[in-house]
Amino acid sequence: MIERGKFRSLTLINWNGFFARTFDLDELVTTLSGGNGAGKSTTMAAFVTALIPDLTLLHFRNTTEAGATSGSRDKGLHGKLKAGVCYSMLDTINSRHQRVVVGVRLQQVAGRDRKVDIKPFAIQGLPMSVQPTQLVTETLNERQARVLSLAELKDKLDEMEGVQFKQFNSITDYHSLMFDLGIIARRLRSASDRSKFYRLIEASLYGGISSAITRSLRDYLLPENSGVRKAFQDMEAALRENRLTLEAIRVTQSDRDLFKHLISEATDYVAADYMRHANERRVHLDQALAFRRDLYTSRKQLAAEQYKHVDMARELGEHNGAEGSLEADYQAASDHLNLVQTALRQQEKIERYEADLEELQIRLEEQNEVVAEAAEMQDENEARAEAAELEVDELKSQLADYQQALDVQQTRAIQYNQAISALARAKELCHLPDLTPESAAEWLDTFQAKEQEATEKLLSLEQKMSVAQTAHSQFEQAYQLVAAINGPLARSEAWDVARELLRDGVNQRHLAEQVQPLRMRLSELEQRLREQQEAERLLAEFCKRQGKNFDIDELEALHQELEARIASLSESVSSASEQRMALRQEQEQLQSRIQHLMQRAPVWLAAQNSLNQLSEQCGEEFTSSQEVTEYLQQLLEREREAIVERDEVGARKNAVDEEIERLSQPGGAEDQRLNALAERFGGVLLSEIYDDVSLEDAPYFSALYGPSRHAIVVPDLSQIAEQLEGLTDCPEDLYLIEGDPQSFDDSVFSVDELEKAVVVKIADRQWRYSRFPSLPIFGRAARENRIESLHAEREVLSERFATLSFDVQKTQRLHQAFSRFIGSHLSVAFEDDPEAEIRRLNGRRVELERALATHESDNQQQRLQFEQAKEGVSALNRLLPRLNLLADETLADRVDEIQERLDEAQEAARFVQQYGNQLAKLEPVVSVLQSDPEQFEQLKEDYAWSQQMQRDARQQAFALAEVVERRAHFSYSDSAEMLSGNSDLNEKLRQRLEQAEAERTRAREALRSHAAQLSQYSQVLASLKSSYDTKKELLNDLQRELQDIGVRADSGAEERARQRRDELHAQLSNNRSRRNQLEKALTFCEAEMENLTRKLRKLERDYHEMREQVVTAKAGWCAVMRMVKDNGVERRLHRRELAYLSADELRSMSDKALGALRLAVADNEHLRDVLRLSEDPKRPERKIQFFVAVYQHLRERIRQDIIRTDDPVEAIEQMEIELSRLTEELTSREQKLAISSRSVANIIRKTIQREQNRIRMLNQGLQSVSFGQVNSVRLNVNVRETHATLLDVLSEQQEQHQDLFNSNRLTFSEALAKLYQRLNPQIDMGQRTPQTIGEELLDYRNYLEMEVEVNRGSDGWLRAESGALSTGEAIGTGMSILVMVVQSWEDEARRLRGKDISPCRLLFLDEAARLDARSIATLFELCERLQMQLIIAAPENISPEKGTTYKLVRKVFQNTEHVHVVGLRGFAPQLPETLPGTQTEDTPSEAS
């Protein structure tokens, strides 16, 4: 069994008192309990808003303004919302176990109108674990949350896999989705459907018996049978159209003769005048064309002379302009020659200064070396003098010490002290604290050896210093050379840069050696380039004169072609006279041939008109008389085949009509006798029981019942056994099935379903195998589907039958036309077209005249061509020897390439000239740059340190030697030896002092002399540097001046400049000569143009006079042609055979037709006036207006629904074919379309019976409903007495009123209305038309009266009215009615929705406290039995044993209003479980 869909929960977001509240809805009854203002109505309003989000309907009564005249604009919704985004969402589970969340986003709109913006949406595929409040809120912290906007909600759901979010722009789409998913019971297609649904919800919400629903129960419970109404409307429309068409045919038949007469006479009248004007116009135009031809010839000659004048003037202007430019170029070439000469003189000065600078550079380098050597020697002298000074000072100090000792008493104590002092000094200097006089000698040897070692190391360092000083000087010299060439650079890069410079120097010298050969090569190429440019100029001038561009390869062939042209032009002059004579002879022959053809043309044109009519009618092209006769035989065969096919299609169409009539029977009975038998037996046709089966199930049930699908279901077979005896008026096989027609099912047979087939076990030994029919007709849907396909087939067959009938008659008329053509025109129709031959001959004649007229001009042109050819040959003779230069496309590139190479070579020469000496000096010393002698300073430091070490070692050795020498001072016995030792030492010191002073004197003298020499060398170096800098600056100035001149001063520059000047002088002379020639030719051309202008003026005067005469005579011709083409009558008026008649013959023809037309249009005022106006010979366009008026008059009288053209001539042809066929066909169609009144009555009666049975089934569900004193509720459906009488008359007494239904002036609806008025004269119909009343009578719902009755106490069955019932009884009765409506909607919508869906059922009840406990229990029982959900509200808790109860209390905390909610489950023992997040009634907890 299919589970019914349920509403799971209701969620309110940001409503007044509810920020984020979800109410879990019970499967049966959910109760909202609370005092006034607790939020019960707000909760229900949120549910209703989500269910029906239509602001035009929503109106919550408890906010209606008392005493207001127009009601509240708010309608109760604006005040229930908080500012910002609000939501109301319904969480549902449908029969397919799909979770669907539907809801609306609400937002207050700022303004006085207190409007609310509503956006419906739906969410599918949401997991069960996700709560609705989680979707639309975002938690900010433990106590704060934020409501998401609709866009944020969509983005959030898009991130969830499998979840679909849909936003709806219309309420219809929103409700359509809810219907398809089983949330609502009825498809709400329109605002009217939504209004019905809202009224039902509103009636449920506020309780009681709703008068709005009870008054219109027919609309709520009875479905509209739109198919029947549409069928009647289509039938009446078809009948009306047929009658109108038949009437039009009759009118058209009377107009046929008038059409023929008017068309024939009007055509002769207008066409004769039209062709006469056309002939006259052609004659006048030929004369005007002759004048215009001469005029154009003269203009062409004048234009040629003007073109020639313009060309010569342009060429003269070019030469004038070229002369100015050539003069400027010549002056520029002269100036350039002067600049080259100046540059050459400047170059000579530069070369002299460069030689002087090179000599100064050598002397400067030599002087630098001398100064450097003198500076080194000066440093050595200074060092030597400083050393001598130090030695003298030391010796003087020592000598002073000994002298002081000698001045004191030579006592032992002094000596002893001196010895002790010497020993202490030795210990200090030698760092020997343990030194004793006894060990001093040993230590003296050691320190003397150390002194010797230090002296040797010092000598070695002196040698290294000398070598390093030399290397340092060489490195600095090489580094300075590299820096001078390359510029500033790091010392570490000197080696790599030096090698690169040396390699580059080799390349630069190599390039510098190529300067002179390159200059010679460049001079040669520049000469060839100038020759090439001259050749290009000659070629451009030649192409300009020839008016065409030529390739170089084409010049030789062109030369030969021009020579051949010269030869041919000379030959063509001799043949000119013979050609002229031949052309004149041919012209005379053409004239005689044209006259003969013009006599034969009218006969041939008449035959062609007839042949073209035949071709248009049959769609074939005929090229011979044999084809015409063969096609006539084919027509006879085609006519026989068409007649046979027409009869076959007609038979098939009749069969389809019969099948449609059989399937259209009410109840699905294919045999009318079955309906009568069903009424006789008190049964129902099986097809009527299954009338509502869907199209998908129709094949199954058709195969299930097989041949018994047309059986009659009767309550008891035993009761009809006697009636079967003697039964003859019945089908051959009559099937009877016992069963209750009101609750019949398919359990009659044991059946096994196979693939597209069933096996029915009729008995133990009898099975029936039936396949599903491909075209089932079981059930109304299947029959309607089959009828629809049959109607489509019938339309095709009808169209085919009409086409074949038309073809048959058309073929017969075509056969007659062919017979007439063969008898009259077959002999001449297939001859050659004489007009085409005339046109061809006229064209040839015009060509001959043109050839004769242009013969003389051809000779002149040939002479001009001869001169041009000779001039071209002369130019080519100058060009051909230079073709090789023109073909050399790389010459300019090679000049540029050589120029670039020469620039590079000159740059290399300048580099070698500037840095050659430095590179030569750098090459032998470049190897010293490999290692940077920057260690020279370190070596100097090492030398100073070694010198200090040697000095220290010497002092230590001297101190030890003094101790050793003073060993005697330590002994008192050695004083004499000590004095003698002191005397010797003093003498040695004096000798050394004298030597040192002498050495110092010599060093000082050498230092002074060498300093003077160094100063002299430095002065010479400064003088050389000053001279070098001065000459270098002068050289730079000269080079800048040379660069400013901007001329390359080489050996051939002067010669090239002079040659260029001479060439320009020659061009200037040639240009002046050509200019003089053009001025003379231009004067001659102007004189010729003046003569032609005078001639042209005379021709223009003659031509304009003739043209003015043509225009004056034919002023209206353009209007005539425009009118003819705009109205499309040119084909009718331009009759070519009339072109060969004379003007008098055409006038006579037109006058005869005019007389006939006056009689024909005497009764038509409009045509008579137009004809009178057309008789004016000066206004030919009025005749066209008359012809158009005749055609328009006839066209307006053509019925477009009958005749398939707007051309009256073609209409006459179609009339002959269509009239009889359409008359017969439409008459038969009207008879078939007409429906009998008995059938109408049967259809309406069967429909009423079916709906009564359905209401009876609905009443069964309400038998046990009781509220208070009300024991039961039922719905009565009765047929109105007046309408029942109408049905009886239609089915039994229709013969008495055939005057209504057989009238051609009344439609069936109007006849039905007239019958109703005839039967009920006492009823006032008001202002309604019979058509409107008849359409209402075709709706079965207008035949029924419906009312609700209750069985109350001792009163029995009473009509349910609010005044007769208590409040609780009215609420219960109203709820019962609403349940019946909902169930009816579900039954009605079952065919529109999937069979696997059972929709949700939910109703509301506000103020439910007015019901007693028994009524509440009845409601619970009703909800459980009908699987319906109910939401009720009461000020007090009614404490039901079943369902869910929410206790609502509105509180205010810190100026914030919220509703406190406690949820309770029913306390019945069978439902012990609690709500999620709540507790049992004994321990209630607050619902979050």
UniProtKB/Swiss-Prot annotation:
Positions contributing to ATP binding: G34, G35, N36, G37, A38, G39, K40, S41
Transmembrane segments: none
Gene3D superfamilies the record matches: 1.10.287.1490, 1.20.58.850, 3.40.1140.10, Immunoglobulin FC, subunit C, MukB, hinge domain
Gene Ontology cellular component terms for the protein in this record: cytoplasm; nucleoid
Record bears the keyword Repressor: no
GO biological process: cell division; chromosome condensation; chromosome segregation; DNA replication
Keywords associated with the record: ATP-binding, Cell cycle, Cell division, Chromosome partition, Coiled coil, Cytoplasm, DNA condensation, DNA-binding, Nucleotide-binding
Stretch list, region Disordered: 1049-1074
Coiled coil residues, start to end: 326-418, 444-472, 509-602, 835-923, 977-1116, 1209-1265
Compositional bias segments (type: Basic and acidic residues): 1051-1065
Subcellular location(s) of the protein: Cytoplasm, Nucleoid
A Pfam cross-reference name: MukB
Listed NCBIfam families: PRK04863.1 (NF003422)
Entry's family note: Belongs to the SMC family. MukB subfamily.
Task of the protein: Plays a central role in chromosome condensation, segregation and cell cycle progression. Functions as a homodimer, which is essential for chromosome partition. Involved in negative DNA supercoiling in vivo, and by this means organize and compact chromosomes. May achieve or facilitate chromosome segregation by condensation DNA from both sides of a centrally located replisome during cell division.
Protein name: Chromosome partition protein MukB
Lineage, opening ranks: Bacteria, Pseudomonadati, Pseudomonadota, Gammaproteobacteria, Enterobacterales
